[in-house]
Amino acid sequence: MTLPPLSHLDRLEAESIHILREVAAEFRAPVMLYSVGKDSSVLLHLLLKAFAPSRPPIPLLHIDTRWKFREMIAFRDRRAAETGVDLRVHINPDGVAQDVSPISHGAAVHTDIMKTQGLKQALEQGGFDAAIGGARRDEEKSRAKERVFSFRNARHRWDPKNQRPELWNLYNARTKPGESVRVFPLSNWTELDVWLYIYREKIPVVPLYFAAPRPVVARDGAWIMVDDARLPLHPGETPQLRSVRFRTLGCYPLTGAIESSADTLEAVIAEMLVSTSSERQGRMIDHAPGASMEQKKVEGYF
């Protein structure tokens, strides 16, 4: 009997599930990083599929910067309750003590303390030896050269020149004392693949990905949403309601929206088919002087 060929989404799904099961089998204490974005939503769906009907043996870890969109936090808690996964939330206590924010300390310092240092704290406190993330190679040039199994030294630093070859679907999971691994099951997916899979599998995502009238101000060539009263308005600034959506989600003062009328999955996919810009165009941290993604990853970033 000849089986019908797998679609490209079926092949990507099978590869990702294989990687998730490989992580569960090879590592002592793996964890999945859950940022609440679309890629994390796909990863959670794949995790549930990989170990169904059992509860996934891998907990979720959310690094909370205290500046995420309110809709993201509500969605995070709702999905954890719906799926029954083991969700752990970490906030860098040092950052809280210093009251670090993107407003008072700037994007680079805020990202380093609340994201990078917060992540390293959580991994060390939890004793995790593998952290699964939703990064994809099509997102950014430094991620394009990262392996599926990306090894980090005892200080969680990434050396792009000291990575192991990966032959076909064979992964070397052996680590040296103190070494850990970041694992990226969505490495070979594109942004369009992610949206097509969300559509096919009916995966819930944060409503911020869909266009709606939202209060925004224009800053540095981007529309910044006024999500709460903590965002100080510049002289002469007045929030205006515009139909916008987000292609990527992070801390709200550092995440630019795009003007759009795409308020359904079908409309988002149609918009994606003609888009000529990167999904990370709205990440203000990427445009800061000296804030290359590779340098942040070398220092321990996702």
Swiss-Prot record:
- What does the record give as the reaction this protein catalyses? sulfate + ATP + H(+) = adenosine 5'-phosphosulfate + diphosphate
Q: Which GO biological process categories is it annotated with? A: hydrogen sulfide biosynthetic process; sulfate assimilation
Q: Which Pfam families match?
A: PAPS_reduct
Enumerate the CDD domains for this protein. Sulfate_adenylyltransferase_2 (cd23946)
InterPro entries under this entry? PAPS_reduct_dom, Rossmann-like_a/b/a_fold, SO4_adenylTrfase_ssu, Sulfate_adenylyltrnsfr_sub2
| GO MF terms, alphabetically ordered | ATP binding; sulfate adenylyltransferase (ATP) activity
Q: Which UniProt keywords apply?
A: ATP-binding, Nucleotide-binding, Nucleotidyltransferase, Transferase
Keyword Nucleotide-binding annotated: yes
Q: What does this protein do?
A: With CysN forms the ATP sulfurylase (ATPS) that catalyzes the adenylation of sulfate producing adenosine 5'-phosphosulfate (APS) and diphosphate, the first enzymatic step in sulfur assimilation pathway. APS synthesis involves the formation of a high-energy phosphoric-sulfuric acid anhydride bond driven by GTP hydrolysis by CysN coupled to ATP hydrolysis by CysD.
The name on file for this protein is: Sulfate adenylyltransferase subunit 2
Per the UniProt record, the source organism is Xanthomonas oryzae pv. oryzae (strain PXO99A)
